[in-house]
């Protein structure tokens, strides 16, 4: 990927956190390389923490609602700290992964989603929760770290109802 494209993607990803209409936020995310489905709502303060070139590792499917000040982490490492020298002894010090939010999920305000996590369809993540592992479909997960506290029973609509 050429340098200008990388810079453009970074600018788009950063601009998303400022107050713009939802449609413009979605457009900026798509321009940055994130896969965003239809009818998605992303509130102000959204942050995607990742290195340039990893934006494709975030997938947000159709009809997902993301509350204000949600952070999704795709990459995390100690940057220029001397801790970086420990990565050979402790490989887990650098984290790179994908985040996949399945259709009809709702992420509450201030939630943090860490790398290598899938949020199942029709799941709810409570406000302020820190999601460290997969959340199964039709679940409510809350807390730090987030734990499933309830399974949802959702009736499927038929064409006649």
Residue ranges and their predicted role:
Residues 1-34, 38-39, 63, 76-88, ...:
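Terminal amphipathic alpha-helical/low-complexity segments used for targeting or macromolecular assembly
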Residues 23-24, 55, 108, 126:
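Short, conserved clusters of charged catalytic residues that mark active-site
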Residues 44-118, 144-145, 152-155, 159:
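Flexible, glycine/small-residue-enriched loop-and-beta-strand segment within the central core
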Residues 118-119, 125, 133:
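Cytosol-/stroma-facing membrane-proximal "stalk/adaptor" domains immediately downstream
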Residues 133-134, 145:
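Conserved functional loop/turn residues at catalytic and ligand-binding sites
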Residues 138-139:
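Extracellular disulfide-bonded cysteine-rich modules/repeats
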